Design a protein with these regions (language model features):
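PLD/PLD-like phosphodiesterase catalytic module centered on the HKD motif
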Residues: 1-173
Length: 174
């Protein structure tokens, strides 16, 4: 519906994708990319822009039916501006990949994304590696925040006298 209303939709789908992108009159505004490279990653980052505001969410699952109907998954809106910017930069990096990216065609096949003449090569997986390495290096060099440094060590807890009865757990049909 959003595609038919003229909304541009960019999706990064690592595996199975049941919707066809670029079908005239249906999904011509839907662009689906697959990133397959050295690392098996899928961020489960969801970004929505209404022309004024960007809302970013992270989730434990994707939108496969088994995840939305048969599992307990969680999604949360990211409010912290620093985290929002970091997640947005990850999405922009992945959407600009022209080394590992394949784009879905209207027939369901995928075509390798090629850089335009003179455009630099963008490998989002190596970019993510560099970003995380730099982040961890900076974290290692920074002094621990006072709240972390002063956190008391956990004390051993005595076991209960009588063990609790085991809970009865049913089986899901999924």
């Amino acid at each position: 519906e959003a595609s038919c209303a003229g909304v541009r939709i960019d999706m990064i789908v690592r595996g199975i994708c049941c919707v066809r992108a670029g079908v005239p009159g249906r999904t011509e505004n839907l662009h689906i990319r697959s990133l397959v490279g050295r690392y098996l990653e899928h961020g489960r980052i969801y970004s929505f822009y209404d022309g004024v505001n960007t809302r970013i969410y992270i989730a434990s699952g994707d939108f496969l039916t088994r995840n939305t109907e048969c599992r307990v998954e969680v999604g949360v809106r990211v409010e912290d501006p620093v985290l929002k910017e970091k997640l947005d930069s990850i999405l922009r990096l992945q959407l600009s990949d022209n080394v590992n990216a394949r784009e879905m065609q209207p027939d369901g096949s995928y075509q390798k994304v090629k850089p335009a003449p003179g455009e630099p090569l963008v490998n989002s997986q190596m970019g993510m590696y560099d970003l995380l390495r730099d982040d961890w290096t900076a974290r290692d060099k920074a002094p621990a925040p006072a709240s972390v440094a002063e956190t008391p060590k956990p004390q051993p807890v005595k076991a209960p006298e009588k063990p609790a009865a085991p809970a009865k757990i049913g089986r899901a049909s999924c």
